[in-house]
Amino acid sequence: MRQTQKEKLLPEQTAEKIRGYIEGNGLKVGDKLPNEFQLAEICGVGRSTVREAIKLLVFSGKVEVIRGSGTYIK
């Protein structure tokens, strides 16, 4: 089954929601994102989906994860 341009996987949709959260809340470079539990609640998804979405955002250069500290806007 081919994915059409309009259909996006849940982690991709969640990454877009997180981008919207960043822009909608005026977060700047260096600001810390909420933790996985909070992002899951904000986005209405599970933590594993949030983790996948964060990986996409890391790959795109939007955020960086500092182990033991959190996820920060890049």
Regions found by a protein language model. Name each.
Residues 1-74:
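Short linear motifs at protein or domain termini
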